């Protein structure tokens, strides 16, 4: 299955490249996008460029990675066709799982785009490597991210502290489409 260009009912999902740097940086530098994990915010274009480098390496290694989401048509004044609504997709991590990732601009949140993109990404990952579990790791206070994981058919398989998070009271939830080995959970929950 070709995964670098997918179409859904409302979205065009394309591989993120350095041509997207300005829009990717604007998304990842937006404090509203990172309200659940402020330490993740990109404070420089160089950090966003390094992020795109890692995406491109992942495409070469995995055959799937992070996709940019653009509306296939105008969806109103705040969401004209062709703009980058966000990024998301599935990436192979630890050679043992598909990590489900999604991040939307504030204007694009609350319209069902995350669920639409996640379904396409999960279907593509399952076609490429059905032997790997689909996993989403989310912060407990990020209710919308939890809802997206649940809509993708994932179930909570772990809850505990979020090591490495500057907020020592943060709680991490791991969702998966099947039971995970103790070893993989241990790997996912280390700092």
Residue ranges of predicted features:
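Conserved GNAT-fold acetyl-CoA-binding loop/helix
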Residues: 32-54, 65-67
